[in-house]
Amino acid sequence: MNKDNLIKNYAVALFNNAVVDNIQDKIFEEITAINRIITDNFDIREFLFSPIVNKNDKVNAVNSLAKNIKMSTIVQNFLLLLVKNSRTAILSNIVDTYNALLYESKNIKIVRVISANKLQPKEQEWIKSRIEKELNQKTEILFDIDSTIIGGIVIKYDSMLQDYSIKGSLEKITKTLKKVRIAA
């Protein structure tokens, strides 16, 4: 099974368990917080991701963490499953996929907007309203910065890419000019 399918299977399983108790948002908050703890703490990350560390030691660590932060049973069992199957390294990907499932269940589209510089709140709101009007759907906008696009914005959602950047325009012009033969 390829990695993307594996990630999706784990995320769907966690999401379906959360749906049973109608606690999808709570589980997302919890799994995101735990992922942040693991990501931000080098020692914890190395311990949980290491193939050398005994699985029983990892199980004990997850159980101890669960007790200390009052982790829900669903999330605790999920993390134990990842540990037992040596899949803790894909937790961040699972969290991202779970987030996508959560927004999809609420009919909210995740849209990534890339700009060359940090956008002001008014600009972000204007872009969000335009995108929601175009898609006729609520959105969750993730704003990223990539100075290589020079100026403008790039909008990505699903498999769509709308490039309104200076870099994109220059690449289109370059491509067109390469096709044109100069008459002598």
From Swiss-Prot:
This protein's name: ATP synthase subunit delta
Classification lineage: Bacteria, Pseudomonadati, Pseudomonadota, Alphaproteobacteria, Rickettsiales
Family: Belongs to the ATPase delta chain family.
Entry's localization field: Cell inner membrane
Function: F(1)F(0) ATP synthase produces ATP from ADP in the presence of a proton or sodium gradient. F-type ATPases consist of two structural domains, F(1) containing the extramembraneous catalytic core and F(0) containing the membrane proton channel, linked together by a central stalk and a peripheral stalk. During catalysis, ATP synthesis in the catalytic domain of F(1) is coupled via a rotary mechanism of the central stalk subunits to proton translocation. This protein is part of the stalk that links CF(0) to CF(1). It either transmits conformational changes from CF(0) to CF(1) or is implicated in proton conduction.
Keyword terms, alphabetized: ATP synthesis, Cell inner membrane, Cell membrane, CF(1), Hydrogen ion transport, Ion transport, Membrane, Transport
InterPro entries reported for this sequence: ATP_synth_OSCP/delta_N_sf, ATPase_OSCP/dsu
Complex and partners: F-type ATPases have 2 components, F(1) - the catalytic core - and F(0) - the membrane proton channel. F(1) has five subunits: alpha(3), beta(3), gamma(1), delta(1), epsilon(1). F(0) has three main subunits: a(1), b(2) and c(10-14). The alpha and beta chains form an alternating ring which encloses part of the gamma chain. F(1) is attached to F(0) by a central stalk formed by the gamma and epsilon chains, while a peripheral stalk is formed by the delta and b chains.
SUPFAM superfamilies membership: N-terminal domain of the delta subunit of the F1F0-ATP synthase (SSF47928)
Main location: membrane
Bilayer topology: Peripheral membrane protein
Any GO MF annotation of the entry: proton-transporting ATP synthase activity, rotational mechanism
Secretion signal span: none
Gene3D superfamilies found in the cross-reference section: N-terminal domain of the delta subunit of the F1F0-ATP synthase
GO annotations of cellular component type: plasma membrane; proton-transporting ATP synthase complex
Keyword Transport: yes
